[in-house]
Amino acid sequence: DDLLHDFSQRTGIVTSRHGNLQWRSIPKTISTDVYRVVQEVLLNIEQHADATQVQVTMANTGNQLCLTIQDNGQGMDTTQLTVKKGIGLKNMRDRIKGLQGQLLIDSQLGQGTQVQINVPCEMID
């Protein structure tokens, strides 16, 4: 929540968080990498999306952490993601892959972007 609050204060982009899963419920071995990926996604939104709203949803479905970050920005052509230079996307994919997880990006020009992170995870009570 501090990350979203700080992001909103710094950028003026309205943020909302949904779901009842708390960061402290995620094992540290997983939460650190996922947190870094969320930071990178927010940085990309700030620098490229021209968004006014960001919604973050965190859920635990079975033994899986499901985190979705969605903005209402300008969107992008996802076919260009593998062509673009830059280490941000590669680092995000590598971090999630290292957790045996999956990073999915869905976007269309003019319709915002959604990043979904799915990671196997036994939650802490």
Feature roles, as predicted:
Residues D1-D125:
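Coiled-coil dimerization/phosphotransfer module
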